[in-house]
Amino acid sequence: MNSITLLQPDDWHAHLRDGLALKRTVPDLAKQFARAICMPNLVPPVKTVEEALAYRERILAHVPEGNNFDPRMVLYFTDHTSPDEVRKIKESEHVNAIKLYPAGATTNSNNGVSDIRKVYAVIEQLEEHQVPLLLHGEVTHNHVDIFDREKRFLDEVLSPLLKQFPKLKVVLEHITTSDAAHFVLEQDRNVAATITPQHLLFNRNDMLVGGIKPYFYCLPILKRQTHQTTLLEVATSGNPKFFLGTDSAPHAQNAKENACGCAGCYSAPNAIELYAQAFDQVGKLERLEGFASHFGADFYGLPRNTSTITLVKEDNLVPESFDYLDNQKIIPLHAGKTLQWRKV
């Protein structure tokens, strides 16, 4: 297969940041996707529908002319989120979900939920109104090994949560382990998962063998190859519980190449080509459209896109860097390497 035409894909998990960063991040994402779930972990975080709509306007100001990119907004779940805010999400045309970060789990997550039992009143409303709860699925206890944090979250947080709220709509975001994949498979249709390009294409050897490579460092961290293999199997299976979410996360070069470097891979500029490469490597390119263009929209109860994109099989050199912020650079995932697919 030398070319493939898909319904325009969507990104169900992306970080755009705010302010000057939007000049870089919004056009990069808008050239790839029709819609994106825009993460709320700004400083300060996006905690109300009003704040989300204001952030959406800031994003729209940077969409290239002639592009119909539609940012879909998310609220940041805190210990102080009001149950009434859930009703406002349900009534909003542009806000689709609420994101729960365990406090301290990732970039700008210090305002996150300290104990999920404290917010059961809000979760009750999420279940009633069928508003999706998006989860960064890791525990954050210092004594838990970083490679075990996802599995511990499933056992200690998510399993009890779904027993208490069996109809809750949940997206377990950026899954990285066989444990998470099998957990999602065992649940009803109200539980789904997103998978990033880096967790399909790479594993912890890519990050750690032959020197530490900071551009593979993200959270949840890359796992061993056996987990990567399982993620590829479920992503390419045609099961609608698994769909595209890049978790594209911009950090300037000096924040990544650092004694204490930031977590996140910037995949937005070549995201769909990265996924195409992953699917093609296992001979499942025909399954890409469902994963990228159908299943996420279906889960969120939104119409599928009607426009299409075409990918052709030809060498596609990923740029070494892009301009970012004031006189800084951002290094994309797979910088300086050649992909086998190009979006035309």
Swiss-Prot record:
Pathway: Pyrimidine metabolism; UMP biosynthesis via de novo pathway; (S)-dihydroorotate from bicarbonate: step 3/3. Zn(2+) 2 binds at residues 99, 136, 174. Its EC number is 3.5.2.3. Substrate binds at residues 15-17, 41, 136, 219, 251, 263. Its cofactor is Zn(2+). Gene3D superfamilies: Metal-dependent hydrolases (3.20.20.140). It catalyses: (S)-dihydroorotate + H2O = N-carbamoyl-L-aspartate + H(+). One of its GO terms (cellular component) is cytosol. CDD domains: DHOase. Keywords: Hydrolase, Metal-binding, Pyrimidine biosynthesis, Zinc. Zn(2+) 1 binds at residues 13, 15, 99, 247. The keyword Nucleus does not apply. GO terms for molecular function: dihydroorotase activity; zinc ion binding. GO terms for biological process: 'de novo' pyrimidine nucleobase biosynthetic process; 'de novo' UMP biosynthetic process. It comes from the Bacteria. The modification N6-carboxylysine is found at residue 99. PANTHER family: DIHYDROOROTASE. Homodimer. HAMAP family: PyrC_classII. This is Dihydroorotase. The gene is pyrC.
